[in-house]
Amino acid sequence: MNIEALKVFKESGEKITCLTAYDASFASVFDACGIDIILVGDSLGNVIQGDKNTLDVSMSDMIYHMQAVAKGTQNALRIADMPYQSYTYAEQTLTNAKRLIMAGAQMVKLEGGCEHEASFRILQGNDISVCGHLGLQPQSVVEIDGYRVQGRGKQGANKIIKNALALASWGVKVIVLECVPAELAKQVSQSVSIPIIGIGAGLDCDGQVLVSYDMLGVHVRHVPRFVKNFLTDNGDVKSAVNAFIKAVKDKSFPSKKYSY
């Protein structure tokens, strides 16, 4: 899988599938099932380290898990989260992004929009592929007082659309859009030429991502409305992953039950 293929998916209407992984074993299963993207997410702070948020995840943590996932992946596109406070200014962003690329990432993901323009631009200028993250941004949960649906009001919706347009203009290749009304996500997807991968953002995104532990029913925290347990009706992890991929590809997931 590569970035050009993701563009073709958007143009053709084929949905993109993405799951998080943090180790070689799960990564190899997901890869063998044909998942399009594996995201080494800072969600490891929640599901691996047992924290209430992702704020204590370090660059060392991300590098360790990225290296492990890279060893278990042959075909899926590998994206790594840049953790909290690892991209506060441009030069720091470039240094840390290079470390993740060296660890096996093919793309790095940054949360936020126009406030990080310098960081997005320096990565583009150094030919490092970037994934954006708009809507609910887990690294900002303290500032926004918890995990809440974003973009419900006109002002918030317009800000998300503005940021998506800006990110696309700065060379961002993909955007993860989290926890927003389905209608807003549809508008965002129609506003930009790059793929929009939703999580709690309705059916009209160009793809779907879930935290793998959530998708498999391994919960150490509150389960968001947008999470579906694919292991319940399937006998093993591989079958659950195949069911997730099929449901995304045939556009049966997420239904309204799992959307806002």
UniProtKB/Swiss-Prot annotation:
The keyword Cell cycle does not apply. It catalyses: 3-methyl-2-oxobutanoate + (6R)-5,10-methylene-5,6,7,8-tetrahydrofolate + H2O = 2-dehydropantoate + (6S)-5,6,7,8-tetrahydrofolate. Mg(2+) binds at D42, D81, E111. GO terms for molecular function: 3-methyl-2-oxobutanoate hydroxymethyltransferase activity; magnesium ion binding. Its cofactor is Mg(2+). The keyword Cytoplasm applies. Binds 1 Mg(2+) ion per subunit. This is 3-methyl-2-oxobutanoate hydroxymethyltransferase. It comes from Vesicomyosocius okutanii subsp. Calyptogena okutanii (strain HA).
